[in-house]
Amino acid sequence: MSSSMSTLRNQFLIAMPHLKDPNFEGTISYICDHNDEGAMGIVINRPLDIRLSDMLAQLELGGEGIAMPVYSGGPVQIERGFVLHSPLGDWQSSIEIAPDICITTSKDILEAMARGVGPDRTLVALGYAGWGAGQLEKEISNNFWITCPADSAIIFRTPDSEKVVSALGRVGIDYHRLSSISGHA
């Protein structure tokens, strides 16, 4: 992370319209960590064709009837599960990213969700988005991404199709007016 750029932890990373990478085209990611070694985030608007009840059944945890979608969190370690949630709770492997947003990777949170006693707000993802040292900063300087402050309501309550527009609207940007052509002044 360059000294000219502060951490992007607890920020949204929104793909510019000209970013045609199939892993990120049209996405909004929540940045969970960002430091000198790189960045890690979860794509929050790409539901998979799988429901949480299906995943819980595959893990033999029960949870029948939970219609919540499971998301494609990114192209790295797509077999690994991540749960963004609020409030923090007492799970084996949780990190508080912001006062109202945590990430957990341990199975105990899924067990609690299957029993109906999990966190109030959740987003379950398989895989994550990762960037090496300096990679994300370079992509931002090349106009592939827009960053803006994260909002838990967008993660947990906003329909997937509205997340990008809602996040940009919070900082006064009209997504529909963004150009699909990039450049530098």
Swiss-Prot record:
Gene3D superfamilies: VC0467-like
InterPro entries in UniProt: AlgH-like
GO cellular component: cytosol
Domain of life from the UniProt record: Bacteria
Record PANTHER family: UNCHARACTERIZED PROTEIN YQGE, UPF0301 PROTEIN YQGE
Stated family: Belongs to the UPF0301 (AlgH) family.
Protein name listed in UniProt: UPF0301 protein HCH_00550
